[in-house]
Amino acid sequence: MNVEELPLLRQSERAAFKRCAWAWYMEYVRRIRPKVELGKEAADFGSLFHIALAEYYIPGLERGPHPADTWDKLSSDVVAAVKTTDYTNDETVAKWEDFHDLGLDLAEAYVELYRGDPHWLVLDAERRFDVIIPDVRYKPMVSEKGKRGYRPIVRVVGTFDLCVRDLNDNQVKMVDHKTAKDIITYHLTLDEQASTYIAVGTTALRHQGLIEPTERIVGMEYNFVRRGRIDDRPTDEDGQRLNKDGSVSKKQGSPNFLRYFVPRTSKERQRQVVRISEEARVMDDVRTGRMPLLKTPQRDCYFCKFFDLCELDESGGDTEYFISTTMQSIDPYADHREGAISSKKLHDA
């Protein structure tokens, strides 16, 4: 099989497949999505904040436009758009007007807290990658000249948020921006996104000449931004929030910002490559009908974009008519097609 004929695979797609193969099939094989998605404002908030940070962390030690300025422009455009759309919804308009102000406050506080991260030498931001993963069922082939070759199974594509050289220890690290309603870290040691990006990232960065052939990415720095109001109460020398009378408040609240580093060893990176290869094989078996297409019913199904379609499918209804009237065709790999312009940067490189 030629490289161009290999199936593409995104990290988010891996998670989607293991969450529910049927929903994965709808989005990544049928390539459909609802024409109108309710409740996706939080995800859009995160996407815009990512762009604001991508414009800020430009290669080198200098920094780009203030994230608040980029956020103001992008979110103002969204507010104007939701006010004029054919699907005008007062609740959506109000939410984005609130998000506009919230994002400005968070961007200002972010820069005030981290001061531009002078210890981060930015190697690249929002860099797309395309890495071939070998089929681990087959042993490497060795040519007469001693070169090792592999039988490919899938092309893993994606986008790194940020890659930096930490001048405090001269180590190369990935940085992943996370906007969320709550900051949760207990699962991150097993997070596959870190493992995947680091596993393929070292190879990608070496090929791009951004790191030396002997260097590797040592881990992922999760850069959390909690989507909540800034607590502007005064603090004591220990950083605890104070009441108006100067006493320490019993309600300290949750931090808006947190950095959490997860290291990855060479064995962990190698194991992730094996896992990607194994999952790609199972996906192909489902895609081609060699394995049954299964669903994973659970209480979170209500929040799935395909919930209504799934209910109709379970009841034996006319799903094809429903798809033709409520769904739109998409390309989940659009960002990674040849010549594509990145949707995650204002100015594509």
Identify the role of each PLM range:
Residues 8, 186-187, 202-349:
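Metal-dependent nuclease catalytic regions and adjoining charged, substrate-binding loops involved
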Residues 14-15, 19-34, 38-61, 100, ...:
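Nuclease catalytic cores
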Residues 33-36, 176-183, 349:
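Glycine- and acidic
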Residues 124-206:
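Non-catalytic protein-protein interaction segments used by genome-maintenance enzymes to assemble
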